[in-house]
């Protein structure tokens, strides 16, 4: 099952939701503002990142700039606690399943969440 972590006001989040819905891909939606991610959720996501916290922290967010914190000097537990307290620190949307992770919306990359049969049929239809 696909988990879509988002905030409703985020344009990229709305695009990701619309894309998944239009391709009839089942997903569970998690509003990170009303249902903050647990530290276990965050740890699970971090295990799938290529660059660790760098991939999930939005250094351009207003919250990040207001906090003026150096994430490189935080322990992982301190960082997870901070993100749990301030979910707007996260880049969004976060889309994940058992094999894939995507941070942000990218129409080419989100295709990885399509079932293999769907992708195969789509490829065959472009060859004809």
UniProtKB/Swiss-Prot annotation:
SS bond list: 10-13
InterPro entries: Arsenate_reductase-like, Spx, Thioredoxin-like_sf, Tscrpt_reg_Spx/MgsR
Compartments in which it is found: Cytoplasm
Gene Ontology BP annotations: negative regulation of DNA-templated transcription
Function: Global transcriptional regulator that plays a key role in stress response and exerts either positive or negative regulation of genes. Acts by interacting with the C-terminal domain of the alpha subunit of the RNA polymerase (RNAP). This interaction can enhance binding of RNAP to the promoter region of target genes and stimulate their transcription, or block interaction of RNAP with activator.
Superkingdom of origin organism: Bacteria
One GO CC term, this protein: cytoplasm
Pfam families membership: ArsC
UniProt name for this protein: Global transcriptional regulator Spx 1
Lineage: Bacteria, Bacillati, Bacillota, Bacilli, Lactobacillales
Organism name: Lactococcus lactis subsp. lactis (strain IL1403) (Streptococcus lactis)
Gene3D superfamilies: Glutaredoxin
Name of the encoding gene: spx1
Family stated for the protein in its record: Belongs to the ArsC family. Spx subfamily.
Complex formation: Interacts with the C-terminal domain of the alpha subunit of the RNAP.
Keywords from the named record: Cytoplasm, Disulfide bond, Redox-active center, Transcription, Transcription regulation
């Amino acid at each position: 099952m696909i988990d879509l972590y988002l905030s409703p006001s985020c344009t990229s989040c709305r695009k990701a939701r619309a894309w998944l819905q239009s391709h009839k891909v089942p997903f569970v939606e998690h509003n990170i503002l009303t249902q903050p991610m647990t530290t276990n959720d965050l740890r699970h996501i971090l295990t799938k990142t290529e660059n660790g916290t760098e991939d999930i922290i939005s250094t351009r967010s207003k919250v990040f700039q207001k906090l003026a914190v150096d994430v490189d000097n935080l322990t992982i537990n301190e960082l997870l606690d901070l993100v749990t307290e301030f979910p707007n620190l996260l880049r969004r949307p976060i889309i994940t399943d058992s094999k894939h992770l995507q941070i942000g919306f990218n129409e080419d990359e989100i295709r990885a969440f399509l079932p293999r049969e769907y992708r195969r049929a789509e490829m065959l239809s472009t060859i004809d």
